[in-house]
Amino acid sequence: MRVAAFHAGLSAERRAAAYLIAKGYRILARRFRTPYGEIDIVARRRQLLAFVEVKARRSLDDAAYAVTRKQQQRIINAAQAWLMAHPEHETFEFRFDAMLIAPRRLPRHLLGAFDAST
């Protein structure tokens, strides 16, 4: 079960990355791991960085509810670590997005799905 979930997650991340590229983003990192958490995708478009959490579920609604407050905090902490490791991006604006993936549906990109102040 865990192996199947892992592969499903990788497939969802590939779909999300392809969707972002089609929207004009450049993928800077995938599966960026820190002691604080993991970021599925770090993407850039112009002077904007998007830290993207990818969620794959049976429906887009189920995927939307899968990003918990605890996960959000881990992603925020990991993003801070990413920014410290990449000072060349310190002047960029950034936001936290979610990419929702469901079978036989186009991905749904939620811009600014959460922020660091919540």
From Swiss-Prot:
Source organism, top-level taxon: Bacteria
A GO molecular function held by the record: nucleic acid binding
One of the Pfam families matching this protein, by short name: UPF0102
Alphabetized InterPro entries for the sequence: Restrct_endonuc-II-like (IPR011335), tRNA_endonuc-like_dom_sf (IPR011856), UPF0102_YraN-like (IPR003509)
Signal peptide: none
PANTHER family: UPF0102 PROTEIN YRAN
Family statement: Belongs to the UPF0102 family.
Protein name: UPF0102 protein Nwi_0116
Record lineage: Bacteria, Pseudomonadati, Pseudomonadota, Alphaproteobacteria, Hyphomicrobiales
